[in-house]
C-alpha cells in the first residue's frame, strides 16, 4: 500500500480530531476523501506527511505507513517523508522568492540528500516543471518575478510545479481549488 494507517488517533491539546482511523490506499490510485467540514480529512492528510507535528500541542497514537514504512518511527527523517509525500494546500503557499527559485528550492534540498530527483540543468528543470502545469508560456519571460505576485490560480499551479522536480511517490491535495474563483479549478485541474 502507498498509505496505510492503523488505529491512528490525533489530539490537538485535549480535543481529539481523529479516532482510531484504519485506512489503506493502494499505490497508483487516485483516491478522494469525502466528508463534512471538520470531520478530519485535512488532519488525516497532514498526518501523512507529518505537518501536524510542527504544532507543539499535537499528540498522535497509532501508525501511518507510507510505502510500507512507519513514518512516525524515530529513525525516519522528516526530510525523507516530505520528499516521498508532497502536499498542495487549500490556499497557495509559494515561497516569497522568485518563480524560478520556488521551483528549484526543494530540488536543491533533496538533490543534496540523494535519492531520485529530476535531472537536467536548473533552467531545464524549471521549464519542464512549469510546462507540466501549463504555466510556462505565461511566466517564461518573468521567472525572477516574486511568486507571491502571481494570481491565486497561478500560485497554486506553481505550488504543484514546485513538487514535480522532487518526484514524490504520493501527492496529497487538500482542496487545492477551494480558495479560487469559479474559473480557477479548471485551470488547476488542467
Regions found by a protein language model. Name each.
Residues 146-150, 154:
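Conserved ABC ATPase signature
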Residues 63-80, 144:
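ABC ATPase NBD Q-loop/coupling interface
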Residues 171-174:
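Catalytic Walker B motif of ABC-type/P-loop ATPase nucleotide-binding domains
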Residues 160:
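Hydrophobic anchor residue at the start of the ABC signature
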Residues 66-70, 119-141, 190:
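Conserved ABC ATPase "signature" region
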